[in-house]
């Protein structure tokens, strides 16, 4: 069972992001405040759960949470400010939207940009240690997956329904064959060969 809270007797928001390593699409982050003493044995790192389980847990998290929100940073913004800063910005946007103001923040990973004047703690593999971070990882992942599934309808050739924008062989082969879309992150090594961009034929 994951820990319910890191900070004792404080309103604490857990944060996590999804899509940092993707070649295409926005980066998503979620912030979740769970009730004091909350318990849920099924909550865990979203990467360890099936898609069906994540979707079911998303509904439960949204019902049970004191507050929750999702923040999004676009590929254009990622290219301007880099993916690390974009991840921080997505988390800040999620925190901005919370209907209850947290008194502290816990974040998956080892880096975070301070949010307002709130105390914060970064926790490596936090999505497998704290319930609110696990909940945030599930919301960020499922909302981003839904977004990539919608983009896949528009651009089916990139196999985004399966790869969600991550750098698979099929995704990179499609970039070579069809070029890039407005959703690709141009600052990334899209072809995996040291080449960032592609020459389009007239």
Positions of PLM-derived features:
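RNase H-like, Mg2+-dependent phosphodiesterase core
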Residues: 1-202
């Amino acid at each position: 069972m994951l820990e319910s809270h890191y900070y004792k007797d404080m309103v604490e928001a857990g944060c996590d992001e999804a899509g940092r390593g993707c070649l295409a699409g926005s980066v998503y982050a979620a912030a979740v405040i769970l009730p004091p003493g909350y318990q849920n044995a099924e909550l865990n790192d979203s990467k360890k759960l099936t898609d069906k389980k994540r979707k079911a847990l998303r509904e439960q998290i949204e019902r049970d949470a004191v507050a929750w929100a999702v923040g999004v940073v676009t590929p254009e913004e990622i290219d301007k400010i880099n993916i690390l800063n974009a991840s921080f910005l997505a988390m800040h946007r999620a925190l901005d939207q919370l209907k209850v103001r947290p008194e502290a923040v816990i974040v998956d990973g080892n880096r975070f940009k301070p949010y307002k004047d709130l105390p914060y703690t970064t926790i490596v593999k936090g999505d497998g240690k704290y319930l609110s971070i696990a909940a945030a990882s599930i919301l960020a992942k499922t909302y981003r997956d839904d977004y990539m599934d919608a983009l896949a309808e528009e651009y089916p050739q990139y196999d985004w329904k399966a790869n969600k924008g991550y750098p698979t062989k099929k995704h990179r082969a499609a970039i070579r064959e069809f070029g890039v879309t407005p959703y690709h992150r141009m600052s990334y090594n899209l072809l995996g060969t040291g080449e960032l961009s592609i020459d389009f034929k007239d």
